[in-house]
Amino acid sequence: MGNLARFGVSLDQDLLEPFDELCRRKSYPNRSEAIRDLIRKALVEEKWNSDAHGAGTLTLVYDHHKNDLSRRLVQIQHDDHDLIVTTLHVHLDHYNCLEVLVLKGEPKRMRALADKLIACRGVKHGTFTGTTTGEDLA
């Protein structure tokens, strides 16, 4: 962190009390660190709405014995291979697999890929989380 700038924040007590509780639950050492995280989150969301590059993770849980699901998932991934940095495949039990894809690229394309994979028949659960590459973020 470069030069620190101090500024005052005025909040209604009805907003401050739950904020302080949030800070305690999340183990923030002080309000300033919590506010910095909130600002970073807003900046990342703003960047995601632009055409800037981002990163993300896609987590899928599926039964690999279902139909032709494994082949379909791999085929879809190959169609957008330039977005996929790496994958992790875990056998949860005899039937269920957990697959984690680390993505990097244009947010719209990453979201579209995630939507395609999550929508495949046989995928039991899927979650996409977008984030920043860290550029231009203090």
UniProtKB/Swiss-Prot annotation:
GO terms for molecular function: DNA binding; DNA-binding transcription factor activity; nickel cation binding. It comes from the Bacteria. Its cofactor is Ni(2+). Binds 1 nickel ion per subunit. Keywords: DNA-binding, Metal-binding, Nickel, Transcription, Transcription regulation. One of its GO terms (biological process) is response to nickel cation. Ni(2+) binds at H78, H89, H91, C97. Gene3D superfamilies: ACT-like. Chain A, domain 2, Met repressor-like. It holds the Pfam family NikR_C. InterPro entries: Acetolactate_synth/TF_NikR_C, ACT-like_dom_sf, Arc_rbn_hlx_hlx, CopG, CopG/NikR_regulator, Ni_resp_reg_NikR, Ribbon_hlx_hlx, TF_NikR_Ni-bd_C. Transmembrane segments: none annotated. Belongs to the transcriptional regulatory CopG/NikR family. Transcriptional regulator. PANTHER family: NICKEL-RESPONSIVE REGULATOR (PTHR34719:SF2). This is Putative nickel-responsive regulator. It comes from Desulfovibrio desulfuricans (strain ATCC 27774 / DSM 6949 / MB).
